[in-house]
A protein has these predicted regions:
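Extracytoplasmic ligand-binding site segments that recognize negatively charged/polar headgroups
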Residues: 46-47, 52, 89-225
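Periplasmic-binding protein-like
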Residues: 119-123, 137, 169-175, 199-204, 210, 281-304, ...
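Extracellular/periplasmic bilobal clamshell ligand-binding domains
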Residues: 307-344
Length: 344
């Protein structure tokens, strides 16, 4: 009896192995072929993980080059690009204009040139080719459709927004977001510290909430919980695509913007491959793929058409130079915190 049991177990094992073998062969036959990798580039960045993952996957599929993403915070990136930071291993940095200007000043970045980079407006690149802007996210006003149809459509400038009136405003707390704080930095560069503080105090009389997250003002405006939400174009476009009753308005008197760009580290021994990747980031095709994936920015490539706002107006940017230091930013935030945020 035990002999037949042994034969049965052996037979079952053989059948199981044959079944596994057939399944494994089927999986191997239908599995996607592994992409051959020609090179690997190490990229330091403080961009959101979803953006860098998307770009890395797209470039691997298209160019067979793996992007090794090294995520940092904005503050860590600033320290890395400071002149006192000597360990500059890696190939590329993807970060804000301020950090790129710091890296150029600290002599950490190589000059780079290409026909595609030559097309980019001087406003969006370094005069010596040490960095180039890829895309930018401007600050916009957002309003619920019902409020927009009544009074909101006439609030089209920063000047009007801070005047006396019955409207309510939600904006992101400058202390919680580098992107939001760029409003403060830009206004001080254009108008000076005293005039900016006075303006922010006037605007503060309308502010019902300083939000923690960037998209909160837009969400509250779209839900008609606030008349006007001050936020980024990328977030406003997201809510429009999701079908929320929200209108996006570009301030006619100019608006701050957050420029993201790229530079090649002097430590890189893959200069040609790095330039090719940055050229790819600048391409109209990459911009179109990003837009299809839901990443709504203004692209520095002049071949990519710029959108207009809900009134049909084109974007007007404040003519700022940027390059604000970490110490300068902290000082301005302290002034805003004491005199505006808690000094009403």
């Amino acid at each position: 009896m035990s002999r037949w049991r042994s034969f049965g177990l052996l037979g079952g094992f053989v059948v199981a192995m044959l079944g596994f073998g057939a399944w494994y062969s089927y999986e191997q036959l239908h599995a996607e072929p592994e992409i051959p990798v020609k090179a690997t580039l190490t990229v330091y960045t403080d961009l959101p993980n979803n953006v860098t993952s998307f770009l890395a996957d797209e470039y691997l599929n298209e160019a067979q080059v793996r992007i090794n993403v090294m995520p940092l915070t904005g503050e860590q990136m600033a320290k890395r690009l400071d002149s006192n930071y000597l360990d500059q291993r890696g190939d590329i940095v993807l970060t804000s204009k301020d950090n790129l200007m710091l890296g150029a000043k600290s002599d950490h970045l190589l000059g780079m040139y290409s026909e595609r980079m030559d097309l980019i407006a001087p406003t969006f690149k370094d005069s010596e080719g040490r960095w180039v802007g890829l895309w930018y996210d401007p600050v916009v006003f957002t309003q619920n459709t019902s409020y927009y149809n009544r009074l909101g459509q006439f609030i089209t400038t920063w000047g009007t927004l801070a005047k006396e009136g019955p409207w309510t405003v939600v904006m992101t707390d400058f202390m919680t977001s580098e992107s939001a704080a760029n409003i403060l930095h830009s206004f001080v560069e254009i108008h000076g510290e005293a005039a900016t503080v006075a303006y922010m105090k006037s605007l503060g009389t309308h502010v019902t909430q300083y939000a923690k997250y960037l998209d909160t003002p837009i969400r509250l405006a779209s839900l008609n919980e606030a008349n006007i939400g001050i936020g980024n174009y990328s977030d406003g476009s997201f809510y429009v695509r999701q079908g929320y009753p929200v209108k996006v308005i570009f301030p006619l008197d100019g608006t701050p913007y957050y420029l993201t760009g790229a530079g090649i580290l002097k430590s890189s021994n893959q200069y040609a491959e790095s330039v090719q990747f940055i050229n790819w980031l600048l391409s109209a095709k990459t911009a179109q793929e990003m837009q299809k994936a839901g990443y709504s920015y203004f692209f520095t490539n002049p071949e990519v058409k710029d959108p207009v706002d809900s009134l049909g107006h084109p974007l007007v940017l404040l003519e700022t130079q940027g390059g604000y230091t970490v110490e300068g930013k902290k000082s301005l935030l302290e002034i805003w915190l004491k005199q505006v945020r808690f000094g009403q």
